Structures are given as C-alpha cells and as structure tokens.
Amino acid sequence: MAVVLAVTLAVPATMAQTEKQTQNVYTVAGVAVDNTAETAATAREQAIVEGHRLAFNRLIARLVPADQRGNIDRPTQSDIVPLVLSYEIEEEKRSSVRYLGMLKFRFRRGEVRAFLQSKGINFAETRSKRVLVLPVYEYAGALLLWDDPNPWLVAWNEVPPSDGLMPLRLPVGDLADIRDISAKQAAAGNAGQLALVAERYGASAVLVAKASVNVEPGTNKRSLGVTTRYFGGTSADRTTVRSFDYSDEDTDETVIRRAAQQISVQVEDDWKQENLLRFDRLNSLVADISLTELRQWVEMREQLRQIAYLQRWQLVSVTRRNASVRLTYYGDAEQLRVALAQRDIVLEQGAVNWSLRESRDARSEPAPQRADEEVPR
C-alpha cells in the first residue's frame, strides 16, 4: 500500500496580508509543483519540468502586456532551459510516488530579451515603486473607507497578490489608518493626508479607487462606476473612469469583485504599456552629478547599472565635486526619467546638460536588489 503524503505548502496570501515581490525582475520564486508517478524520482523529475513551464509563464505574465501574450507559442522544455540561469528547491516533501516542492528560478535576461525580440514581442522590465490603494465606496450618499461593511475594500482584499511590475499594497485598516485619513479626505484628494498615509506604508503614490452602484432611471439597469486617480509618483493626477454592467444573474458582490480584479490587472498592464523597451530607438544624453563625497558617485553608479532602459553609460569626467556621465538609452527621455524615479534618482533638464540627483523625498522602501545580469556599460 502506497504511503500517502500529507503536507501543506505555503498558500498565497491576499494583498492585505503580504506584498509578494521577487528579488529582481528575472527571478520567479514560490513556484509550487505537485506530481505523482510510479516512483518519487520520476515524480520529482516531472515536477521540475513542470516548474520550468510554470516559472516561464509567470515571467511572461510579468513582462509582457496582455494583448501580446497570445502571440507567444507554447514553448517546449528545450525552448525554456536555455533561458534559465539557475533554479533551486526552496522546500520539498515526497512519498514513494508523490513529490511536492516549492521552486525558485533565475532567468537569463539577455536570452529572454533575445527570445521575445525574435518573436516581435514588446515587453517591459521596469518595476514600479510601491503604490497604496485606497478603495472608497459610495453608498446611499455616504463615503465609506474604514467603515464596516465596505464591500469595495473587501473585494480588493480578495485580489490575489501580484509579483508583477506594479506592487500594489492595501492598507491594514487599523487605528493609525483611521487617524491619518478619512473616506471624505481620500475621495477629495487631500494632499497632506494622502502623503501621510503613503509615507507610513513606504509608498511612492496612492491610487484612490472610488466606486458606486448606479441605477438608470426608467430601466432600472444597474452598473458599477469606478474612478481611479493617482496622487504622487510618476503618474500623479492620472484619472481613469470605468463602468461595469450587470448581467441578469449578477449581484452587487459579484460585480464589485469582478471590478476589483479587472482594475488591478489593468493598472499593471497600463504600467507595462507605458514602460515598454524600445530597442529600435536609441538615444543619448549627458548628465551632471553634484558630489559632496565620492561615496555618492559609487552609489549612483550601482543604481545606474540596474536601469533596464540603459544600453550603456560612460563616465565623461569626474572631480571631487562633480561627475558627468553619458547615458545611452532605449526609448525617450521621459521613459528613462520614470525608470530612474523608481530608484529614487531625479533626472532634470538644465540649460546645457541634464542633471542627476538623489530624490529628496526618497521613501524608506528598500530599492530592489541587483539583477542577475547587469546592463552592459
């Protein structure tokens, strides 16, 4: 009689419980596999093959906009293996016929780029800084945020966490949150209170998502209207209005849940679309950096190595007080500016040259770790 393996692996938490982030864009962690075969060795072998496929799919979902992913044929194992730098087993359990594991994959950036470019697929690599979502629900003329019930906040809490390029964070809803900002202040875009709660959560921006159920007079046709607006960050003041219609079977709860899920996906996809790497557009600029000590240049240099848009950078001159660098980058200067901002670096255009400096309002959020493969200089 076969031994039954009873084990519980880590279950993905909700957005409110955890902010799942990989160490860098080309690392895919927490890949769960569960395979049964005639022997444990065979089950393990099959599980690792399956893990390669699952990790590749997650990487593609992370980098490639939704409208492009359908253009990628399902790859074979022989297609995927050359793209993998390494993999490791984070945890595993096995019986005589079953294998369960949690795997972590590191992909080769250069090879993945070449793979996607060969298929004409556009993709992004820039990870946004953390964004705090405040779901405000309007009901019977009242604005709800921390109130119970707030079905809109509940729906956002049920959205699975994303390990994509746009890390969204939901507030806990504790006394500090209630003290810092009210539903009315969030809906009105009170800059001071929004900045206060954003700083406490280490967020670079706040996305206020206001929802209300609308009923069309005469027909009683129902829809959920949602307005989202960014406060702070590189997308400040961007506003989007969407409407979600009800079917005959829909309830408020089902439509609200669907809207939260779709908007979270759309927010991620919008970020990717705005930060696509344009390999066919190569530009350059010279930027000056004011220095008070050499350590600043060393830190700036390490940050520049992590910017996906940079094809290379070249030190033009350096003194005890100043440095000048030539940045050769893909796309336009605005995309480069946004990418640098995610690393707390400000790019500004001066009378002659551009300038680079550390952001004065850098959050306490730690910068993403270094990628497995650095951008060539």
Cite the ranges covered by each PLM segment.
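N-terminal segment of the mature soluble domain
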Residues: I48-I72, R127-K129, V133-N190, M300, ...
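Bacterial N-terminal signal peptides
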Residues: A2-A10
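Signal peptide-directed extracytoplasmic domains
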Residues: V64-P135, L145-P151, N157, G189
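Sec/Tat signal peptide C-region and signal peptidase I cleavage site
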Residues: P12-A16
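Short, well-ordered alpha-helical segments
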Residues: V33-T76, Q193, T254-Q266, R295-Q306
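Amphipathic beta-strand/beta-sheet edge segments enriched in Tyr/Trp
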Residues: T27-G30, R109-E111, Y201-D252, Q335-R337, ...
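A short, hydrophobic beta-strand-centered structural micro-motif
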Residues: P82-E91, R169-P171, A186-T219, S317, ...
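C-terminal soluble interaction/assembly domains
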Residues: T234-E253, R258-Q262, W271, N275, ...
